[in-house]
Protein backbone atom coordinates (compact mmCIF):
# COMPACT_ATOMS: atom_id res chain seq x y z
CA UNK A 1 0.00 0.00 0.00
CA UNK A 2 1.25 3.50 -0.77
CA UNK A 3 1.64 6.31 1.73
CA UNK A 4 -1.19 8.16 -0.02
CA UNK A 5 -3.67 5.74 1.58
CA UNK A 6 -2.70 6.87 5.09
CA UNK A 7 -4.55 9.50 7.07
CA UNK A 8 -2.00 11.50 9.04
CA UNK A 9 -2.38 14.33 11.54
CA UNK A 10 0.27 15.96 13.71
CA UNK A 11 0.28 17.79 17.03
CA UNK A 12 3.16 19.53 18.80
CA UNK A 13 3.97 18.33 22.31
CA UNK A 14 6.26 19.75 25.04
CA UNK A 15 10.05 19.25 24.87
CA UNK A 16 10.02 19.50 21.06
CA UNK A 17 8.03 16.30 20.69
CA UNK A 18 5.70 15.72 17.75
CA UNK A 19 2.69 13.42 18.00
CA UNK A 20 1.86 11.79 14.68
CA UNK A 21 -1.53 10.08 14.49
CA UNK A 22 -1.77 7.57 11.65
CA UNK A 23 -4.88 5.80 10.39
CA UNK A 24 -4.11 2.67 8.37
CA UNK A 25 -6.87 1.30 6.09
CA UNK A 26 -8.16 -2.22 6.67
CA UNK A 27 -6.74 -3.65 3.46
CA UNK A 28 -3.24 -2.62 4.48
CA UNK A 29 -3.74 -4.28 7.88
CA UNK A 30 -4.83 -7.46 6.11
CA UNK A 31 -1.82 -7.36 3.80
CA UNK A 32 0.51 -6.99 6.78
CA UNK A 33 -1.12 -9.96 8.54
CA UNK A 34 -0.82 -12.16 5.42
CA UNK A 35 2.82 -11.16 4.97
CA UNK A 36 3.51 -12.08 8.61
CA UNK A 37 2.08 -15.57 8.03
CA UNK A 38 4.25 -16.03 4.93
CA UNK A 39 7.35 -14.78 6.73
CA UNK A 40 6.82 -17.03 9.74
CA UNK A 41 6.06 -19.99 7.48
CA UNK A 42 9.42 -19.54 5.75
CA UNK A 43 11.36 -19.39 9.02
CA UNK A 44 9.66 -21.97 11.27
CA UNK A 45 10.74 -25.61 11.52
CA UNK A 46 7.98 -28.14 12.23
CA UNK A 47 8.48 -31.94 12.19
CA UNK A 48 6.91 -33.52 9.12
CA UNK A 49 6.88 -30.32 7.07
CA UNK A 50 9.44 -28.74 4.78
CA UNK A 51 10.39 -25.16 5.59
CA UNK A 52 7.95 -22.83 3.83
CA UNK A 53 5.41 -25.61 3.24
CA UNK A 54 3.63 -25.54 6.60
CA UNK A 55 -0.16 -25.32 6.06
CA UNK A 56 -1.74 -22.11 7.28
CA UNK A 57 -4.04 -23.84 9.77
CA UNK A 58 -1.13 -25.78 11.31
CA UNK A 59 1.00 -22.64 11.51
CA UNK A 60 -1.73 -20.68 13.30
CA UNK A 61 -2.32 -23.59 15.67
CA UNK A 62 1.40 -23.95 16.48
CA UNK A 63 2.27 -20.27 16.84
CA UNK A 64 -1.01 -18.89 18.07
CA UNK A 65 -2.88 -15.92 16.68
CA UNK A 66 -1.29 -13.44 19.13
CA UNK A 67 2.26 -14.06 17.92
CA UNK A 68 1.21 -13.71 14.28
CA UNK A 69 -0.72 -10.52 15.01
CA UNK A 70 2.23 -9.12 16.98
CA UNK A 71 4.60 -9.81 14.09
CA UNK A 72 2.17 -8.20 11.64
CA UNK A 73 1.62 -5.18 13.88
CA UNK A 74 5.34 -4.53 14.41
CA UNK A 75 5.96 -4.43 10.67
CA UNK A 76 2.79 -2.43 10.06
CA UNK A 77 3.77 0.26 12.56
CA UNK A 78 7.30 0.48 11.17
CA UNK A 79 6.22 0.76 7.53
CA UNK A 80 3.35 3.15 8.31
CA UNK A 81 5.71 5.42 10.28
CA UNK A 82 8.21 5.56 7.42
CA UNK A 83 5.47 6.28 4.90
CA UNK A 84 3.85 8.91 7.13
CA UNK A 85 7.02 10.95 7.70
CA UNK A 86 7.73 10.81 3.97
CA UNK A 87 4.16 11.76 3.08
CA UNK A 88 4.11 14.73 5.50
CA UNK A 89 7.79 15.71 4.96
CA UNK A 90 8.55 15.27 8.66
CA UNK A 91 12.11 15.16 10.02
CA UNK A 92 12.17 13.33 13.37
CA UNK A 93 15.50 13.15 15.22
CA UNK A 94 14.65 10.13 17.37
CA UNK A 95 12.96 6.77 17.09
CA UNK A 96 9.18 6.95 17.66
CA UNK A 97 7.34 5.76 20.76
CA UNK A 98 3.79 4.44 20.76
CA UNK A 99 1.62 6.70 22.90
CA UNK A 100 -0.71 3.88 23.97
CA UNK A 101 1.87 1.12 24.29
CA UNK A 102 2.23 -1.93 22.05
CA UNK A 103 0.16 -4.39 24.12
CA UNK A 104 -2.86 -2.11 24.20
CA UNK A 105 -2.71 -1.56 20.45
CA UNK A 106 -2.29 -5.30 19.84
CA UNK A 107 -5.58 -6.01 21.61
CA UNK A 108 -7.44 -3.65 19.26
CA UNK A 109 -5.66 -4.86 16.10
CA UNK A 110 -7.93 -6.91 13.85
CA UNK A 111 -6.74 -7.64 10.30
CA UNK A 112 -9.24 -6.18 7.87
CA UNK A 113 -10.28 -3.36 10.21
CA UNK A 114 -8.99 0.20 10.05
CA UNK A 115 -6.29 0.87 12.68
CA UNK A 116 -5.41 4.21 14.26
CA UNK A 117 -2.39 4.79 16.49
CA UNK A 118 -0.26 7.71 17.64
CA UNK A 119 3.52 7.79 17.60
CA UNK A 120 5.66 10.43 19.27
CA UNK A 121 9.19 11.44 18.34
CA UNK A 122 11.61 14.27 19.02
CA UNK A 123 11.99 16.92 16.35
CA UNK A 124 14.51 19.73 15.96
CA UNK A 125 13.43 22.70 18.08
CA UNK A 126 12.75 26.17 16.71
CA UNK A 127 14.89 28.55 18.78
CA UNK A 128 13.76 32.16 19.15
CA UNK A 129 15.44 35.20 20.68
CA UNK A 130 13.38 37.76 22.58
CA UNK A 131 16.02 40.36 21.78
CA UNK A 132 19.36 40.52 19.97
CA UNK A 133 20.52 44.13 20.32
CA UNK A 134 21.31 46.22 23.37
CA UNK A 135 22.19 43.23 25.53
CA UNK A 136 24.05 43.92 28.77
CA UNK A 137 26.95 41.56 29.39
CA UNK A 138 29.72 41.26 31.96
CA UNK A 139 33.12 39.65 31.75
CA UNK A 140 35.98 39.07 34.14
CA UNK A 141 39.12 40.99 33.24
CA UNK A 142 42.37 39.10 32.77
CA UNK A 143 45.47 41.08 33.69
CA UNK A 144 48.98 40.16 32.63
CA UNK A 145 50.96 39.36 35.79
CA UNK A 146 54.67 40.00 35.29
CA UNK A 147 55.52 38.17 38.51
CA UNK A 148 54.52 34.89 36.87
CA UNK A 149 57.68 35.08 34.76
CA UNK A 150 59.78 34.67 37.90
CA UNK A 151 57.47 31.91 39.15
CA UNK A 152 57.82 29.97 35.89
CA UNK A 153 61.59 30.34 35.96
CA UNK A 154 61.68 29.10 39.57
CA UNK A 155 59.51 26.13 38.61
CA UNK A 156 61.98 25.27 35.84
CA UNK A 157 64.87 25.59 38.31
CA UNK A 158 63.16 23.10 40.62
CA UNK A 159 62.59 20.66 37.75
CA UNK A 160 66.27 20.86 36.80
CA UNK A 161 67.51 20.85 40.39
CA UNK A 162 69.77 18.18 41.83
CA UNK A 163 68.30 16.46 44.89
CA UNK A 164 70.89 15.96 47.65
CA UNK A 165 70.64 14.61 51.21
CA UNK A 166 70.39 17.02 54.15
CA UNK A 167 72.73 16.50 57.08
CA UNK A 168 73.04 18.21 60.43
CA UNK A 169 69.88 20.31 60.44
CA UNK A 170 66.12 20.14 60.91
CA UNK A 171 63.52 20.16 58.14
CA UNK A 172 62.91 23.52 56.50
CA UNK A 173 60.37 24.89 54.07
CA UNK A 174 61.30 23.81 50.55
CA UNK A 175 62.87 20.50 51.62
CA UNK A 176 61.69 17.07 50.50
CA UNK A 177 60.78 14.98 53.54
CA UNK A 178 60.57 11.19 53.41
CA UNK A 179 57.77 10.44 55.85
CA UNK A 180 55.98 7.53 57.39
CA UNK A 181 52.64 8.58 58.83
CA UNK A 182 49.26 7.36 60.01
CA UNK A 183 46.20 9.58 60.38
CA UNK A 184 43.17 9.15 62.62
CA UNK A 185 40.10 11.30 63.20
CA UNK A 186 40.17 13.05 66.56
CA UNK A 187 36.43 12.70 67.20
CA UNK A 188 36.18 8.90 67.06
CA UNK A 189 39.74 7.62 66.62
CA UNK A 190 38.94 5.92 63.31
CA UNK A 191 41.68 5.57 60.71
CA UNK A 192 41.57 8.05 57.83
CA UNK A 193 41.09 6.35 54.47
CA UNK A 194 44.15 7.09 52.34
CA UNK A 195 45.73 8.91 55.29
CA UNK A 196 48.64 6.56 55.90
CA UNK A 197 51.96 5.77 54.22
CA UNK A 198 55.08 3.76 55.09
CA UNK A 199 57.43 5.94 53.06
CA UNK A 200 56.30 8.94 51.05
CA UNK A 201 58.15 11.93 49.61
CA UNK A 202 56.42 15.12 50.75
CA UNK A 203 57.40 18.51 49.34
CA UNK A 204 57.49 20.95 52.24
CA UNK A 205 56.79 23.86 49.95
CA UNK A 206 53.79 23.16 47.76
CA UNK A 207 50.96 23.01 50.31
CA UNK A 208 49.35 19.85 48.93
CA UNK A 209 48.75 18.40 52.39
CA UNK A 210 45.95 19.53 54.69
CA UNK A 211 46.49 22.60 56.91
CA UNK A 212 48.83 21.91 59.83
CA UNK A 213 50.57 18.86 58.35
CA UNK A 214 53.58 20.51 56.69
CA UNK A 215 53.85 23.07 59.46
CA UNK A 216 54.17 20.16 61.90
CA UNK A 217 56.96 18.53 59.90
CA UNK A 218 59.07 21.69 59.64
CA UNK A 219 61.58 21.65 62.49
CA UNK A 220 61.70 17.85 62.79
CA UNK A 221 65.00 15.99 62.54
CA UNK A 222 65.67 12.69 60.77
CA UNK A 223 64.64 9.79 63.00
CA UNK A 224 62.28 11.93 65.05
CA UNK A 225 58.60 11.00 65.55
CA UNK A 226 55.77 13.23 66.70
CA UNK A 227 52.00 13.66 66.61
CA UNK A 228 50.66 16.57 64.56
CA UNK A 229 47.16 17.99 64.92
CA UNK A 230 45.42 19.05 61.68
CA UNK A 231 41.97 19.94 60.45
CA UNK A 232 40.41 19.14 57.09
CA UNK A 233 39.07 22.17 55.17
CA UNK A 234 35.30 22.60 54.93
CA UNK A 235 35.55 22.21 51.13
CA UNK A 236 37.71 19.06 51.21
CA UNK A 237 36.85 16.72 48.29
CA UNK A 238 35.95 13.77 50.55
CA UNK A 239 32.66 14.78 52.12
CA UNK A 240 32.99 12.65 55.28
CA UNK A 241 36.30 14.38 56.16
CA UNK A 242 35.17 17.99 55.74
CA UNK A 243 35.85 20.16 58.77
CA UNK A 244 36.97 17.24 60.95
CA UNK A 245 40.02 17.41 63.19
CA UNK A 246 42.69 14.76 62.81
CA UNK A 247 45.93 13.60 64.40
CA UNK A 248 48.86 12.28 62.36
CA UNK A 249 51.61 10.15 63.89
CA UNK A 250 54.61 11.18 61.76
CA UNK A 251 58.15 9.82 61.50
CA UNK A 252 60.78 11.74 59.51
CA UNK A 253 62.77 8.93 57.87
CA UNK A 254 64.97 10.98 55.57
CA UNK A 255 65.43 14.56 54.44
CA UNK A 256 66.53 15.91 51.07
CA UNK A 257 66.79 19.30 49.47
CA UNK A 258 67.23 20.75 46.01
CA UNK A 259 70.39 22.34 44.70
CA UNK A 260 69.07 24.82 42.17
CA UNK A 261 71.02 25.69 38.99
CA UNK A 262 72.38 29.21 38.57
CA UNK A 263 70.23 31.67 36.63
CA UNK A 264 72.62 32.06 33.72
CA UNK A 265 72.60 31.54 29.97
CA UNK A 266 73.50 27.88 30.44
CA UNK A 267 70.29 27.44 32.44
CA UNK A 268 68.29 29.24 29.73
CA UNK A 269 69.59 26.81 27.11
CA UNK A 270 68.84 23.81 29.33
CA UNK A 271 65.36 24.98 30.28
CA UNK A 272 64.21 26.26 26.89
CA UNK A 273 65.10 26.83 23.26
CA UNK A 274 66.46 30.29 24.10
CA UNK A 275 70.19 31.10 24.19
CA UNK A 276 70.22 33.72 26.94
CA UNK A 277 68.34 34.56 30.13
CA UNK A 278 67.25 37.83 28.52
CA UNK A 279 65.72 35.93 25.59
CA UNK A 280 64.10 33.44 27.98
CA UNK A 281 62.45 36.21 29.98
CA UNK A 282 61.29 37.97 26.82
CA UNK A 283 59.82 34.72 25.46
CA UNK A 284 57.98 33.95 28.72
CA UNK A 285 56.64 37.51 28.93
CA UNK A 286 55.24 37.27 25.40
CA UNK A 287 53.69 33.85 26.07
CA UNK A 288 52.00 35.11 29.22
CA UNK A 289 50.74 38.24 27.47
CA UNK A 290 49.34 36.16 24.61
CA UNK A 291 47.71 33.78 27.10
CA UNK A 292 46.16 36.70 29.02
CA UNK A 293 44.82 38.13 25.77
CA UNK A 294 43.30 34.78 24.75
CA UNK A 295 41.65 34.33 28.14
CA UNK A 296 40.38 37.89 28.05
CA UNK A 297 38.81 37.29 24.63
CA UNK A 298 37.32 34.01 25.86
CA UNK A 299 35.84 35.73 28.91
CA UNK A 300 34.34 38.50 26.77
CA UNK A 301 32.82 35.96 24.40
CA UNK A 302 31.44 33.89 27.28
CA UNK A 303 29.83 37.00 28.76
CA UNK A 304 28.23 37.93 25.46
CA UNK A 305 26.90 34.42 24.81
CA UNK A 306 25.58 34.18 28.38
CA UNK A 307 23.62 37.40 27.85
CA UNK A 308 22.32 36.07 24.53
CA UNK A 309 21.25 32.74 26.06
CA UNK A 310 19.16 34.67 28.59
CA UNK A 311 17.11 35.90 25.62
CA UNK A 312 16.66 32.40 24.20
CA UNK A 313 13.37 30.57 24.04
CA UNK A 314 13.84 26.93 23.12
CA UNK A 315 12.38 23.58 24.13
CA UNK A 316 15.29 21.13 24.12
CA UNK A 317 14.37 17.62 22.91
CA UNK A 318 15.54 14.70 25.01
CA UNK A 319 17.27 13.07 22.03
CA UNK A 320 19.65 16.02 21.64
CA UNK A 321 20.36 16.21 25.37
CA UNK A 322 21.19 12.51 25.45
CA UNK A 323 23.42 12.79 22.38
CA UNK A 324 25.32 15.77 23.79
CA UNK A 325 25.72 13.97 27.12
CA UNK A 326 27.15 10.98 25.26
CA UNK A 327 29.57 13.29 23.45
CA UNK A 328 30.82 14.63 26.78
CA UNK A 329 31.26 11.12 28.20
CA UNK A 330 33.12 10.03 25.06
CA UNK A 331 35.42 13.04 25.41
CA UNK A 332 36.15 12.03 29.00
CA UNK A 333 36.86 8.45 27.91
CA UNK A 334 39.20 9.68 25.17
CA UNK A 335 41.14 11.77 27.69
CA UNK A 336 41.52 8.76 29.98
CA UNK A 337 42.65 6.62 27.05
CA UNK A 338 45.33 9.18 26.17
CA UNK A 339 46.64 8.80 29.72
CA UNK A 340 47.04 5.07 29.14
CA UNK A 341 44.03 3.96 31.19
CA UNK A 342 42.01 0.86 30.30
CA UNK A 343 38.80 2.60 29.31
CA UNK A 344 36.87 -0.61 28.54
CA UNK A 345 37.27 -1.98 32.06
CA UNK A 346 37.01 1.41 33.76
CA UNK A 347 33.84 2.62 32.04
CA UNK A 348 31.30 0.16 33.40
CA UNK A 349 27.59 0.54 32.52
CA UNK A 350 26.91 1.98 35.99
CA UNK A 351 29.71 4.54 35.63
CA UNK A 352 28.52 5.54 32.17
CA UNK A 353 24.98 6.06 33.49
CA UNK A 354 26.31 8.23 36.32
CA UNK A 355 28.51 10.22 33.95
CA UNK A 356 25.59 10.72 31.56
CA UNK A 357 23.43 12.02 34.40
CA UNK A 358 26.17 14.27 35.81
CA UNK A 359 27.01 15.71 32.40
CA UNK A 360 23.38 16.60 31.63
CA UNK A 361 23.54 20.23 32.92
CA UNK A 362 26.64 20.93 30.83
CA UNK A 363 25.04 19.22 27.82
CA UNK A 364 21.95 21.41 28.11
CA UNK A 365 24.08 24.54 28.49
CA UNK A 366 26.09 23.66 25.38
CA UNK A 367 22.92 23.12 23.38
CA UNK A 368 21.44 26.43 24.55
CA UNK A 369 24.60 28.29 23.55
CA UNK A 370 24.58 26.61 20.14
CA UNK A 371 20.89 27.31 19.50
CA UNK A 372 21.24 30.92 20.69
CA UNK A 373 24.02 31.56 18.18
CA UNK A 374 22.12 29.75 15.41
CA UNK A 375 19.05 31.87 16.13
CA UNK A 376 21.17 35.04 16.10
CA UNK A 377 22.63 34.21 12.69
CA UNK A 378 19.13 33.67 11.31
CA UNK A 379 17.53 36.68 13.00
CA UNK A 380 20.22 39.11 11.84
CA UNK A 381 20.95 37.38 8.51
CA UNK A 382 24.63 36.89 9.35
CA UNK A 383 26.25 34.93 6.55
CA UNK A 384 29.73 33.94 5.44
CA UNK A 385 31.45 35.32 2.39
CA UNK A 386 32.82 32.64 0.04
CA UNK A 387 36.02 34.59 -0.55
CA UNK A 388 36.67 34.77 3.21
CA UNK A 389 36.21 31.00 3.47
CA UNK A 390 38.64 30.36 0.61
CA UNK A 391 41.22 32.75 2.05
CA UNK A 392 41.05 31.12 5.48
CA UNK A 393 41.25 27.65 3.94
CA UNK A 394 44.48 28.58 2.18
CA UNK A 395 45.95 29.88 5.44
CA UNK A 396 45.03 26.70 7.30
CA UNK A 397 46.40 24.44 4.56
CA UNK A 398 49.74 26.26 4.68
CA UNK A 399 50.13 25.23 8.32
CA UNK A 400 49.36 21.58 7.58
CA UNK A 401 52.21 19.17 6.98
CA UNK A 402 52.56 17.84 3.45
CA UNK A 403 51.72 14.27 4.49
CA UNK A 404 48.71 15.23 6.64
CA UNK A 405 45.57 13.28 5.72
CA UNK A 406 42.63 15.67 5.94
CA UNK A 407 39.06 15.27 4.73
CA UNK A 408 38.54 18.37 2.52
CA UNK A 409 34.84 18.63 3.37
CA UNK A 410 35.42 18.35 7.11
CA UNK A 411 38.24 20.88 6.93
CA UNK A 412 36.06 23.34 5.04
CA UNK A 413 33.24 22.87 7.55
CA UNK A 414 35.62 23.47 10.46
CA UNK A 415 36.86 26.67 8.84
CA UNK A 416 33.28 27.81 8.22
CA UNK A 417 32.36 27.12 11.85
CA UNK A 418 35.33 29.16 13.10
CA UNK A 419 34.60 32.06 10.78
CA UNK A 420 30.90 32.09 11.69
CA UNK A 421 31.82 32.09 15.38
CA UNK A 422 34.11 35.08 14.82
CA UNK A 423 31.41 36.96 12.90
CA UNK A 424 28.76 36.28 15.52
CA UNK A 425 31.05 37.38 18.37
CA UNK A 426 32.00 40.52 16.45
CA UNK A 427 28.34 41.34 15.83
CA UNK A 428 27.44 40.80 19.47
CA UNK A 429 30.30 42.97 20.70
CA UNK A 430 29.24 45.78 18.37
CA UNK A 431 25.58 45.60 19.36
CA UNK A 432 25.89 44.91 23.11
CA UNK A 433 27.08 46.74 26.20
CA UNK A 434 30.01 44.82 27.65
CA UNK A 435 31.11 45.75 31.17
CA UNK A 436 34.31 44.66 32.86
CA UNK A 437 33.97 43.25 36.36
CA UNK A 438 36.71 42.77 38.91
CA UNK A 439 38.41 39.37 38.91
CA UNK A 440 37.19 36.98 41.56
CA UNK A 441 39.83 36.18 44.20
CA UNK A 442 41.58 32.88 43.56
CA UNK A 443 40.76 30.25 46.16
CA UNK A 444 43.69 28.61 47.90
CA UNK A 445 42.07 25.27 48.63
CA UNK A 446 44.45 22.68 50.02
CA UNK A 447 43.85 19.03 49.44
Swiss-Prot record:
GO terms for biological process: 'de novo' cotranslational protein folding; cell division; chaperone-mediated protein folding; protein transport; protein unfolding. PROSITE patterns: FKBP_PPIASE. It holds the Pfam family Trigger_N. It is found in: Cytoplasm. Its EC number is 5.2.1.8. It comes from the Bacteria. Involved in protein export. Acts as a chaperone by maintaining the newly synthesized protein in an open conformation. Functions as a peptidyl-prolyl cis-trans isomerase. HAMAP family: Trigger_factor_Tig. Belongs to the FKBP-type PPIase family. Tig subfamily. This is Trigger factor. It comes from Synechococcus sp. (strain CC9902).
Amino acid sequence: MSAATLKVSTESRPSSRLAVTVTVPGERCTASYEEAIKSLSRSINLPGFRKGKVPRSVLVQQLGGVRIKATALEKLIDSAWRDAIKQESLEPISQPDLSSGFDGLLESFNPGDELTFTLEADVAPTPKLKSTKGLKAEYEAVVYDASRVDSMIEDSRKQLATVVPVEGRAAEKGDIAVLGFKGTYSDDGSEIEGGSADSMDVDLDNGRMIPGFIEGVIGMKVGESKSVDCQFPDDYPKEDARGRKAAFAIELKDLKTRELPELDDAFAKQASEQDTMADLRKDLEQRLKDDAERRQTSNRNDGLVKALVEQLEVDLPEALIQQESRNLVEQTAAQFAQQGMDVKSLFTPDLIRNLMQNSRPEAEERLRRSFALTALAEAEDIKLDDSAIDTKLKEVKKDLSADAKVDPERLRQAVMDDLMQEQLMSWLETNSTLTEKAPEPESDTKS
